[in-house]
Amino acid sequence: SKDLMKVIRDEAQNPYISLFRDKFIPSIVNDRPDLIGVSITATSQIIPGLTLCRLIKEAAPDLHITIGGSIFTRLVDNIRRCPSLFDITDDIVVFEGETALLELVNQMAGKKDFSKVPNLIYRQNGKITVNQPFYSENVNQLPAPNWMPCSSSVGTSGAAFNRVGCSVASALMRPERTWSITVEAPP
């Protein structure tokens, strides 16, 4: 974790610093969103994602940054031992984030009781807190994504699939954790 924190600050070796500082940070800071979510789902996204978080926090420490993604789900135990990570983010959502993000937004707008947010890891009074037990979404109760209007260049119908778990065959890809819909494009 110390090496990672060095890399995201290394002006000579990290090409994302100047790119983000010049092209993205000014508009993010000007827009002043209530919540910035950074999803990191592959190891190749760790350095750019954390670099972005660091630059936002340095430019606007009051903006709330939440990190999520499967990388951090796999690193839950390591996150507990990495307090420096919370210098560049306010919290981390592990496992599934639909309910967690909704409750996080509700708490930010209300009592700010982050202990009520499932799957959240955050630092409070210098202590890293991991909200457990971890919550698993019932995918059958989630709304289907709205990809309309469909592009007519791909034909008049197609199938959309969503899978909870990794993108390769594993025990996580049980049939009850998968749903599909058929999408018909308008004529």
Residue ranges and their predicted role:
Residues 4-135:
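Glycine-rich beta-alpha loop elements in corrinoid/cobalamin-binding modules
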Residues 132-135, 139-146:
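C-terminal beta-strand edge segments of enzyme domains
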Residues 140, 147-187:
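Radical SAM [4Fe-4S] cluster-binding motif and immediate context
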